[in-house]
Amino acid sequence: MGRKWNNIKEKKAQKDKNTSRIYAKFGKEIYVAAKSGEPNPESNQALRLVLERAKTYSVPNHIIEKAIDKAKGAGDENFDHLRYEGFGPSGSMLIVDALTNNVNRTASDVRAAFGKNGGNMGVSGSVAYMFDHVATFGIEGKSVDEILETLMEQDVDVNDVIDDNGLTIVYAEPDQFAVVQDALRAAGVEEFKVAEFEMLPQTDIELSEADQVTFEKLIDALEDLEDVQNVFHNVDLK
């Protein structure tokens, strides 16, 4: 695999200036996960995975507790998971994941964001085949060889382990998220810099300076939408 985890790096780099937006998105996702089963991460795997991801973004406990309490109590909102696919300038491709209580509103908003920023909505499947769905972990303080040895000793299969500027990145199948994380914890990993699900492009592209400006405006417009949870793309942003 060996590709950079650009989408996650960009999201984390923006955390300080977009803290409230990221926290709001996690609050919604935690509520949906808690409402889908028991509001207890010990018995609700979906909730556990969301909370593990939230830790890497330092989501405050009061936001987590508020979302879970809402799911326990009078919260009666129902949300749908939606995925949109589209194109930006010069062969750029985007996947937009949303969580919404109004499908028509979200579809209209996403289509408008594409149309006003040099992009076009595609049909389902027009882009996703160029991406791989993976669980991504980032670990400091342990080398690629150490992580590989740990995983082999515990008979845990992963897709790839690479070094990215001193951060060891582990790619695994999405359904192995908890298995891989538990194995790494058992080997002494106490903190994950990254613990995410990602749509990873099979090939990255580079854009001209002008196209990159347009593309970044498109990304910002999509991520600013209330219903959008994640935007993945195939552009190597400089």
Curated annotation (Swiss-Prot):
Record key words, sorted: Cytoplasm, DNA-binding, Transcription, Transcription regulation
Superkingdom: Bacteria
Chief localisation class: cytoplasm
GO cellular component, one term: cytosol
Subcellular location: Cytoplasm
SUPFAM superfamilies (UniProt xref): YebC-like
GO molecular function: DNA binding
Entry keyword tRNA-binding: no
Gene3D superfamilies: 1.10.10.200, 3.30.70.980
One annotated GO biological process: regulation of DNA-templated transcription
Family per similarity comment: Belongs to the TACO1 family. YeeN subfamily.
HAMAP family (alphabetical): Transcrip_reg_TACO1 (MF_00693), Transcrip_reg_TACO1_YeeN (MF_00918)
This protein's name: Probable transcriptional regulatory protein SAOUHSC_00675
Organism of derivation: Staphylococcus aureus (strain NCTC 8325 / PS 47)
